[in-house]
Amino acid sequence: MSKNLSCIIQAGHLAYSEDPAFLCAICGNGVVVTVRDRLLCIGGMIHVVYPKSEPEDRPTNFHVDTALGSLFKVLLDLGSSSNNDREAQIFGGGHQNGLGKKRAEDCVRKIRKIFKDKKIKIVSEDIGGSLGRKIIFNTYTGETAAIKTSRIRRMDWLPEWEHLIGVKRIAYLQRQ
């Protein structure tokens, strides 16, 4: 890895590199997916929160269907032509006190279905549970490190915690 490229992927974002790179993400109940072409040694990462975009929604990379479609297009544009040469990994989908559990499970189910339909092999999964994850993905080798931790920011548990954080903040300000 001569250039030592790296970036942190936020929820709703997609990143890829045709040069060797480290792609990182921190997730609570979101789901992080990596897809890599084994022959070309290129890959990308998405960080999704919702299983699919509804007709009334503007499609964004927060949604599994949109984000994976975008990542597949990028890989195709970079020369990856066969799903047989691609491999995938799925991480995240944790929950605290059940918050976001169903949504995270729906995301994982949708991701698995898309990979099954496209005949892309899932080589690794680390999903569910009550801990968040910090993920580092090497696009060149496909190696991934996933650290389970309770020490992530509250905002990494969004969108469920967004409401609770706002409520706590208001209650705190009212006591002042």
Name these PLM-found stretches:
Residues 4-25, 39:
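Phosphate-centric recognition/catalysis
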Residues 6-11, 18, 30-31, 136-143, ...:
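Cofactor- and metal-binding active-site motifs of prokaryotic enzymes
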Residues 20-81:
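Conserved mixed alpha/beta catalytic, RNA-binding, or beta-rich assembly cores of soluble enzyme
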Residues 21, 32, 42-44, 87-89, ...:
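Structural motif
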Residues 78-86, 121-127:
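Flexible, glycine/charged-enriched surface loops at secondary-structure junctions
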Residues 90-94:
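Glycine-rich beta-strand-to-loop/alpha-helix junction loops that act as flexible
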Residues 95-106:
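Phosphate/ribose-phosphate-bearing ligand recognition and processing surfaces
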Residues 106-176:
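Divalent-metal-activated hydrolytic enzyme cores
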